[in-house]
Amino acid sequence: MHVRSLRAAAPHSFVALWAPLFLLRSALADFSLDNEVHSSFIHRRLRSQERREMQREILSILGLPHRPRPHLQGKHNSAPMFMLDLYNAMAVEEGGGPGGQGFSYPYKAVFSTQGPPLASLQDSHFLTDADMVMSFVNLVEHDKEFFHPRYHHREFRFDLSKIPEGEAVTAAEFRIYKDYIRERFDNETFRISVYQVLQEHLGRESDLFLLDSRTLWASEEGWLVFDITATSNHWVVNPRHNLGLQLSVETLDGQSINPKLAGLIGRHGPQNKQPFMVAFFKATEVHFRSIRSTGSKQRSQNRSKTPKNQEALRMANVAENSSSDQRQACKKHELYVSFRDLGWQDWIIAPEGYAAYYCEGECAFPLNSYMNATNHAIVQTLVHFINPETVPKPCCAPTQLNAISVLYFDDSSNVILKKYRNMVVRACGCH
């Protein structure tokens, strides 16, 4: 038994680029009219060269110049947990939830949040316009003693220098957790303010710009969300101006309060309550992969042949189409991509893999209605039947493609959730 090589059906099908390489789990399947797939998988271990080729191709499609090697701080920190909530929301939105059709099995999370979702309805709204979400870990945090009237501040810094080119910030949030306070400030009201640091000075306070503030009771607990969209855009365009954020807590009469005493959790708190930043991005330009030529030389050679007997060739074509009826018609077949088998489980959080599928089969005259043939393909089939040396048969290609979302760490241990379009074949047809 051997693994069949897959044929490139159309230039927009990414599967064609991986056809010689997908040997780890490919299968031929009968695809019935009710979209039920029956398959018998063929397994064999990848050789080192094959693994490297696959890794290089998939990284290129994911838009990554190299394999990320993060200094992992744990998948159960607050930032990865928040991003997992967004990942699950995006999967449900695009049909990847239980019973959904958008993402094919197995498309599931590696771990669960096992608690109330961190993401809000507003975050889900931001997902609608975004094609990439990044969370950023706090690089520096320490309390500073300033001159009157501000005595207590907490500083946060985030590295936005690794943002891919062509991505624009559509929304950005700073998130910090506030615990319930049982003593001292029982009935007190706090004003929590977040500032952008414009310029730092020796011996006096930094120049600050107020970004957002919230007023709340000392007894309140939960995640506090501050809008920092404006400064995030500025930092992406001018990274040298990124001097971080400052946070202050005051009573309504202006008394400065230590953020820790107000219940705000810093980097030394529990993993699932540490502060972080999240930004939503949308691509301002589309990048296309170059399409490799496959078989154009052979096709031109076939077209250059002039038959001596046109009628004999036409009769041979009739026989060819008769035998095509006995061969498999254009259908969807199973093809599973396993990130775990590629050894990427240390930086890809979710999914472990996904069912990509591919299209293969005959597009012979006459085309049946279930082949999802275009009008052009119908005409092309007829012309090929009459004059096969002039026009080739239509190709079996995807007619519907779906996206997948991939959640992963970058080199700086930031968590990225990115949507990749046209990655899963939903339906096949003749083109």
From Swiss-Prot:
Homodimer; disulfide-linked. Interacts with SOSTDC1. Interacts with TWSG1. Interacts with FBN1 (via N-terminal domain) and FBN2. Interacts with type I receptor ACVR1. Interacts with type II receptor ACVR2A. Interacts with NOG; this interaction inhibits canonical BMP signaling. Interacts with SCUBE3. Interacts with ERFE; the interaction inhibits BMP-induced transcription of HAMP. Interacts with TGFBR3. This is Bone morphogenetic protein 7. It is found in: Secreted. Glycans are attached at N187, N302, N321, N372. PROSITE patterns: TGF_BETA_1, TGF_BETA_2. Growth factor of the TGF-beta superfamily that plays important role in various biological processes, including embryogenesis, hematopoiesis, neurogenesis and skeletal morphogenesis. Initiates the canonical BMP signaling cascade by associating with type I receptor ACVR1 and type II receptor ACVR2A. Once all three components are bound together in a complex at the cell surface, ACVR2A phosphorylates and activates ACVR1. In turn, ACVR1 propagates signal by phosphorylating SMAD1/5/8 that travel to the nucleus and act as activators and repressors of transcription of target genes. One of its GO terms (biological process) is positive regulation of apoptotic process. Residues 291-311 are annotated as: Disordered. Several N-termini starting at positions 293, 300, 315 and 316 have been identified by direct sequencing resulting in secretion of different mature forms. GO terms for molecular function: BMP receptor binding; cytokine activity; growth factor activity; heparin binding; protein serine/threonine kinase activator activity. GO terms for cellular component: extracellular region; extracellular space; vesicle. Its main location: secreted. CDD domains: TGF_beta_BMP7 (cd19397). It comes from the Eukaryota. Residues 30-292 form a propeptide. The lineage of its organism: Eukaryota, Metazoa, Chordata, Craniata, Vertebrata. SMART domains: TGFB (SM00204). PANTHER family: BONE MORPHOGENETIC PROTEIN 7 (PTHR11848:SF135), TGF-BETA FAMILY (PTHR11848). Disulfide bonds join C330-C396, C359-C428, C363-C430.
